[in-house]
Regions:
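A charge-rich, low-complexity, intrinsically flexible signal that marks solvent-exposed coils, linkers
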Residues: 1-87
Length: 87
């Protein structure tokens, strides 16, 4: 496990204990960076038109298409720190 993998794992745990809930924009960004960092480019069909939450998540992840998993992990770690993470 690399140093970045350890930081990414720590950030995932830390995000669950943030004292203030991130706003919707930051939540979508966290979701997209997590998915890109753990799975890579978006896979599977886009959710249906009336699945607003699923569509928003899919589109946020889709915007990161082509971003390396390592870069997404680093951005995730930095965002969690910005939101008050202390790991």
């Amino acid at each position: 496990m690399t140093d970045l993998d350890k930081k990414f794992a720590a950030a995932q745990a830390e995000v669950k204990t943030l004292t203030k809930r991130p706003d919707n924009e930051d939540m979508l960004r966290l979701y997209a960076l997590y998915k890109q960092g753990s799975e890579g480019d978006v896979k599977g069909p886009k959710p249906g038109f009336f699945d607003f939450v699923g569509s928003a998540k899919y589109e946020a992840w889709e915007k990161l298409q082509g971003t390396s998993q390592e870069d997404a992990q680093q951005q995730y770690v930095e965002l969690v720190k910005k939101l008050g993470g202390s790991f």
